[in-house]
């Protein structure tokens, strides 16, 4: 009692956040810190459309404090939510640019890693590859 469940689809399967009766909102993994986004650039997103809708919804939320899993607690989540949206849109534009000529999935992934100067390892291949896969 006193806890509101907030649906946060997109980043992973059926993710949820919680608002407590003292107006603290726990946002789970629905957004990342600027530092994380700047370092890794491309994270795992299960459903990009749903993820962007979730970020737009989060951007409009009001609470005493927001507690994301991958960022510092804050009283205003708007700027961080917008940064996450902007990062996703920038990457989407880069993917469209890369796909101007036909190529296989692995080549697209390679070009994306090269464009963002990322190091390919198994973990990154799985996370980023899962995000890019249709």
Per-region residue spans from a language model:
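Metallo-beta-lactamase
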Residues: 2-92
């Amino acid at each position: 009692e006193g806890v509101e469940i907030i649906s946060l689809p997109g980043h992973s399967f059926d993710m949820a956040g919680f608002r407590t009766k003292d107006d603290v909102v726990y946002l789970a993994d629905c957004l990342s810190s600027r530092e994380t986004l700047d370092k890794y650039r491309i994270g795992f997103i299960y459903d990009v459309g749903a993820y962007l809708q979730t970020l737009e919804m989060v951007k409009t939320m009001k609470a005493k404090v927001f507690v994301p899993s991958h960022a510092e607690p804050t009283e205003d989540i708007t700027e961080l939510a917008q940064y996450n949206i902007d990062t996703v849109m920038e990457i989407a534009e880069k993917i469209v640019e890369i796909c101007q000529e036909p190529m296989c999935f692995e080549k697209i992934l390679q070009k994306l890693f090269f464009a963002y100067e990322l190091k390919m390892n198994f973990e990154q291949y799985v996370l980023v590859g899962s995000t890019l896969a249709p």
